[in-house]
Amino acid sequence: MSLELLSKLETKIQATLETIELLKMELEEEKQKASTLSEQNQQLTEQNQQLQQELASWNDKVTGLVGLLNSEI
């Protein structure tokens, strides 16, 4: 191989290595975003469950009050 071909090959290899490093950094960023989104999803799921329980409790209270009103009428 000529020196020119070796130089071109070296340049391409270096560019490929740089691309790989950039992709690794992007992958790490995406993993962090996914982790954050997963935590937020878990928090929202828990909050949703709590709100559903509160709603059910209020519905029971309202149903009880309506029942009391109907029995007094």
From Swiss-Prot:
Main localization (coarse): cytoplasm
GO biological process assignments: division septum assembly; FtsZ-dependent cytokinesis
Coiled coil: 3-67
Protein localization: Cytoplasm
Record-level GO cellular component terms: cytoplasm
Record keywords: Cell cycle, Cell division, Coiled coil, Cytoplasm, Septation
Quaternary structure (record): Homodimer. The ends of the coiled-coil dimer bind to each other, forming polymers. Interacts with FtsZ.
Functional description taken from the UniProt entry: Non-essential, abundant cell division factor that is required for proper Z-ring formation. It is recruited early to the divisome by direct interaction with FtsZ, stimulating Z-ring assembly and thereby promoting cell division earlier in the cell cycle. Its recruitment to the Z-ring requires functional FtsA or ZipA.
Record-given protein name: Cell division protein ZapB
Gene this protein is translated from: zapB
